[in-house]
Swiss-Prot record:
<keyword id="KW-0443">Lipid metabolism</keyword>
<dbReference type="GO" id="GO:0005509">
    <property type="term" value="F:calcium ion binding"/>
</dbReference>
<feature type="binding site">
    <location>
        <position position="47"/>
    </location>
    <ligand>
        <name>Ca(2+)</name>
    </ligand>
</feature>
<feature type="disulfide bond">
    <location>
        <begin position="73"/>
        <end position="97"/>
    </location>
</feature>
<feature type="disulfide bond">
    <location>
        <begin position="65"/>
        <end position="138"/>
    </location>
</feature>
<dbReference type="GO" id="GO:0047498">
    <property type="term" value="F:calcium-dependent phospholipase A2 activity"/>
</dbReference>
<comment type="subunit">
    <text>Monomer.</text>
</comment>
<keyword id="KW-0442">Lipid degradation</keyword>
<feature type="binding site">
    <location>
        <position position="64"/>
    </location>
    <ligand>
        <name>Ca(2+)</name>
    </ligand>
</feature>
<feature type="disulfide bond">
    <location>
        <begin position="59"/>
        <end position="111"/>
    </location>
</feature>
<keyword id="KW-1199">Hemostasis impairing toxin</keyword>
<dbReference type="InterPro" id="IPR036444">
    <property type="entry name" value="PLipase_A2_dom_sf"/>
</dbReference>
<keyword id="KW-0800">Toxin</keyword>
<dbReference type="InterPro" id="IPR033113">
    <property type="entry name" value="PLipase_A2_His_AS"/>
</dbReference>
<dbReference type="GO" id="GO:0005543">
    <property type="term" value="F:phospholipid binding"/>
</dbReference>
<feature type="disulfide bond">
    <location>
        <begin position="44"/>
        <end position="60"/>
    </location>
</feature>
<feature type="binding site">
    <location>
        <position position="45"/>
    </location>
    <ligand>
        <name>Ca(2+)</name>
    </ligand>
</feature>
Length: 138
């Protein structure tokens, strides 16, 4: 019960797309994005700088780059349309910007699923100085 309360409190600050992204990660990777990816490596959860620490962190790097290419709407606040079945997510709707955000989130959720074996607890809450080297270009 305490865990549900904590999760509810965390989700109060999550708006729009970030909540949808959390749901996609749960669907595709079978785990909570907030719990597993909110403070991982140099790119998962904190914006990002430096070199991705492993394949899982690279999923977040690519996701950040994808969001950086979106124009015309706010990736972290916009609601998009999508449907899901057993093994996939399909982005829908008529708004190209919203569909682009959805595709960014979809690709990251699939990347997390495909790289579950690379997740390493040593990259959880890495010191900020680890991520101070120059970032590679998107």
């Amino acid at each position: 019960m305490r865990t549900l309360w904590i999760l509810a409190v965390l989700l109060l600050g999550v708006k729009g797309n970030l909540l949808q992204f959390e749901m996609m990660i749960n669907k595709m990777a079978g785990r909570s994005g907030i719990r597993w990816y909110s403070d991982y490596g140099c790119y998962c959860g904190k914006g990002g700088h430096g070199q991705p620490q492993d394949a899982t962190d690279r999923c977040c790097f690519v996701h950040d780059c994808c969001y950086g290419k979106v124009s015309g709407c706010d990736p972290k606040m916009a609601f998009y349309k999508y449907s899901s079945d057993k093994n996939d997510i399909v982005c829908g709707g008529n708004n190209p910007c919203l569909k682009e955000i959805c595709e960014c989130d979809r690709a990251a959720a699939i990347c997390f699923r495909d790289n579950l074996s690379t997740y390493d607890n040593k990259y959880w809450n890495v010191p900020s100085e680890t991520c101070q080297v120059e970032s590679e270009p998107c």
